[in-house]
Amino acid sequence: AEGWSLALKYSNLYYLIGEKGFIDEYHSAGIWLSLAVFMIVLYYIGRKKLKISAEFILLLGGFVGLLAPFFLPQMHERYSFFAEVFLILYVILKPQKFYLPVFQSLTSFMGYSIFVAQDWSLPIQYMPFITLTVLCLTGYEVYKYINDPGNQEVASC
């Protein structure tokens, strides 16, 4: 369809594979891919008995907030606010992870620059790599938290 796109200024997966072609096919496949990724993440987290802390809630909120717009089609740049807020709050607890919200905010800023300045500061094809890097680093932090023996609940008899 004329004027339709799989990516609406959010630097996600569809800028890597092409946001203009196969819109109907990729749209449906993207929704199913997103569902599969979420189910895998939920299964992995759900099979562990974890101590729920503020750190984990903020970290998981940031991870889910990055995961959804990266894999779902037709995401606007404003959908990253959720992740940015959680990552900024996470940095209050873990200041050494300051780079997570900084780089995520950079990609959002680039998405807005097309409207404000009518120009991309960096070609959009490079931006998903920054978003993917932040997503992977945040996912790794979730993985470390889940597998830390200090965060496991002890089973009682």
Spans of model-derived segments:
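Membrane-interface helix-boundary signature
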Residues: 23-30, 51-58, 77, 94-97, ...
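Transmembrane helical bundles and short interhelical boundary loops of multi-pass, membrane-embedded
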Residues: 1-6, 10, 61, 94-157
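Membrane-embedded alpha-helical segments of multi-pass membrane proteins
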Residues: 32-36, 79-87, 127-134
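Hydrophobic alpha-helical transmembrane segments
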Residues: 43-49, 66-73, 88-93, 112-116
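Membrane-interface catalytic loops of GT-C/OST-like multi-pass glycosylation enzymes that act
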Residues: 72-83, 116-124
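Juxtamembrane/interfacial segments around transmembrane helices
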Residues: 16-24, 83, 88-93, 105-117
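Hydrophobic, membrane-inserted alpha-helices
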Residues: 37-41, 61-68, 81-88, 107-112
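Aromatic/glycine/proline-enriched transmembrane-helix motif characteristic
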Residues: 2-70, 146
